[in-house]
Design a protein with these regions (language model features):
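Short loop/turn microsegments at loop-to-beta-strand junctions
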Residues: 32-33, 54-55, 155-157
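C-terminal motif of bacterial Sec signal peptides marking the signal peptidase cleavage site
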Residues: 14-18
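Structural microenvironment flanking redox-active thiols in thiol-disulfide oxidoreductases
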Residues: 73-134
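Thiol-/selenol-based redox modules, centered on thioredoxin-like
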Residues: 146-193
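N-terminal "domain-start" segment that seeds a small globular fold
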Residues: 21-48, 73
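Structural micro-motif
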Residues: 120, 132, 139-144, 153-159
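Short active-site neighborhood of thiol/selenol oxidoreductases, capturing the structured segment around
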Residues: 46-69, 75, 92
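Bacterial N-terminal signal peptides that target proteins for export
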Residues: 1-8
């Protein structure tokens, strides 16, 4: 009888360990560099202010003629789905055209979507070279504004950033956006320290 009780206790312990050890599968672990930028209301948002929070990021610009509208529509849908499940997550959209995307312009752009600013910041307040370097170093994302052009080349991914400021995953933000996978990963990331 003691052997059975011992086996049951051991099995129970293993089950508890397995349930508490959720991990992000194949995390990217890119370190986001410290930043302090302005949001659509002219308020500062920094990596420090996001510390301890799970957040989603993308790169957009308001004059975009191709991928930014569907990306913003998909992020809006994701925001709605996360809210419906009472999942607390911040969303950060970095402008890749800071010369043209001042806070007022970002707010006007966002008004085209049924989104909430409660947990979503559209950021600007840096130079073109700064955002190009920041995107590459922090997200391994290409951002490039060709000379004399009004369109900017940039990644179309959504990025999941953990509470430790590391990029954990990236997802397609334009087509077949994997909402369920993102939501599951956000839930898992919320348990990480």
């Amino acid at each position: 009888m003691k052997v059975i009780k011992g086996l049951m206790a051991g099995l129970f312990f293993l089950l508890l360990c397995a349930c508490g050890g959720q991990q992000i599968k194949d995390p990217l672990n890119y370190e986001v560099e410290p930043f302090t930028f302005q949001n659509q209301d002219g308020k500062n948002v920094s990596l420090e202010s996001l510390k301890g929070e799970v957040w989603l990021a993308d790169f957009i610009f308001t004059n975009c003629e191709t991928i930014c509208p569907p990306m913003t529509a998909h992020m809006t849908e994701l925001q709605k789905k996360l809210k419906a499940e009472n999942i607390d997550v911040r969303i950060v959209s970095f402008s890749v055209d800071p010369e043209n995307d001042k806070p007022k312009q970002l707010k006007k752009f966002a008004a085209n979507y049924p989104l909430s600013f409660d947990n979503w910041d559209f950021l600007t307040g840096y130079s073109q070279s700064d955002i190009e370097a920041f995107a590459l170093k922090s997200f391994k994302a290409i951002v490039k504004k060709p000379e004399g052009e009004d369109q900017v080349i940039h990644q179309s991914s959504f990025y999941l950033v953990g509470p430790n400021g590391k990029v954990l995953k990236d997802y397609n933000g334009v087509e077949n956006t994997p909402y369920d996978d993102i939501i599951a990963d956000v839930k898992t990331a919320s348990t990480l320290k």
